[in-house]
């Protein structure tokens, strides 16, 4: 895909696929027979839909960073380099009615919103706080329960108990639906997460937890804030477990599809663990400080494993033409640009009015 000197991490600007890494990428697909069967069962349309999702996620972040640099907004929380952890799992779920699953993203999993069916303009409107956005200008976290997206909660780590409750409702109603959420490595220090996973294990809830270890919590490396291995957690709580490559969208897809099948079969919760890397700052305001937390070799290591570039190279190896990929990129770029323009128009025409501030705060009897 096109690289943007003003917005992309420097490691991405001259990105080319490393032959050895691509051999590992292909081998990863076939390393587990169950996951291999899931991937090999995907149609070309499904594979290209995943590609569109990765592009949409990356270009969403590019648009936000463009807004920051041009003064439209003051900062943005981006998921550059972590797109596979979001897009693969979301595409493994049911994203339409009947029986739409429910996801509860962190702010860095914004791709879950548009891949579950929210128009991308709605996500941009949320950042701008417009009155016609999903929250009516009351929250900068995007979500829409009609699309199966529970908005993030500002208190880090408070979402897992909520998604566990949603999964409990599926179980009690006999609905063939699954809940899913992501947990950052830093968020694992929150007590509510442990309560949620324990409850899900005891009640055999149809829910998937993904520990998204991007190596850093705000400005604290995982080696400083956590001891032991997250791989031990599933056994601790008596739930199914697994690990996938956080920069490999197909491995993420397959692991999540199997976990969803496990839940739908009445076998209960799954805790998946994945390693990836935050290529920028906690938000756009601290990128320089964030890059001082790790040495240049670490950024090069993860930069060479760009999840969008790796998947694009894999698709070409599977016979998808460069022209076809470029056409898809042009379509998605136009979609994202149009969504950003719609949101900017809303900022001019549909900002929330002060006399509506108390509306929607309490439910009426």
Each model region followed by its residue ranges:
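Short acidic, gly/pro-rich beta-turn/loop elements at beta-sheet edges
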Residues: 113-115, 219, 282, 353
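Cofactor-binding active-site loop characterized by glycine-rich and histidine/acidic residues
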Residues: 65-203, 221-231, 236-238
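Short acidic/polar alpha-helix capping motifs at helix-coil junctions
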Residues: 26-31, 129-131, 196-198, 276-278
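Conserved acidic/glycine
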Residues: 1-85, 282, 288-365
